[in-house]
Amino acid sequence: MSESNFIQKVGAACNKKEDLYQKSKTRYAVRSIFAGGFLTLSTAVGAVAADLLNTFVPGSGRFLFPFIFAWGLVYLLFLNAELTTSNMMYLTAGTYLKKIHWKKALEILLYCTFFNLIGALIVAFLFNQTTAFAHVDPKGFLATVAENKLQRSNQVVFFEGVIANIFVNIAILSYLYFKDETAKVLLALSAIYMFVFMTNEHLAANFASFSLLSFNSVSSQLPHFEFLNILRHYSVTFFANWVGGGVLIGLAYAWLNNIKSLYND
């Protein structure tokens, strides 16, 4: 009996990632930069749109922002960018299935994470040179969401992060399994919309929102927007996202499919 579709796709993904990383770390870095950049693009536009909509119907921006943000994930999926939180699923599953050594998987994951942040910082800097970000309101959508996130305890951040990356990797698995392009887009949008609407903690999404604020003078008006607090938040979110996407989705699906059975993915 041949390997399941899931195992074949995870193996191919791990081989592709490791091959590019070994042959050209610069090119792998650029693909990772694109992922952070794409999410920052959609975050910035979503935040501006949410503030505008809130002026007409207070509170309604929370419904619009997740929809616009979710397109950033669609871009990176179709344009082959490297996202840390989806790599948590691929590389954890690949390690369990012996498609990649755990040391190499961890190295690639950390490398990808760093350059996701670099991509977010680059696009955030560019946006902060535009008129749309010339007068960011400390009571506006982006600043309010960021400040609320940075007030959370480690325990709350952890559970929010676990849930976020379950949603994200539901989107990734849907993208892997479905052949119809429209179905891929709709399923990805639905899963991403849900975690963003719930303001769950997603590392790359936080890279985007915190970076946009870091280049803006409004950050000085946010009491919890401090370097060490942001670093704490990133660290807890990274681990939580790995548990949600890497263990509860990646490892679970790898285990489910690591058997000779008619019932596999």
Give each language-model segment a name:
Residues M1-D265:
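Alpha-helical transmembrane segments and their helix-helix packing motifs
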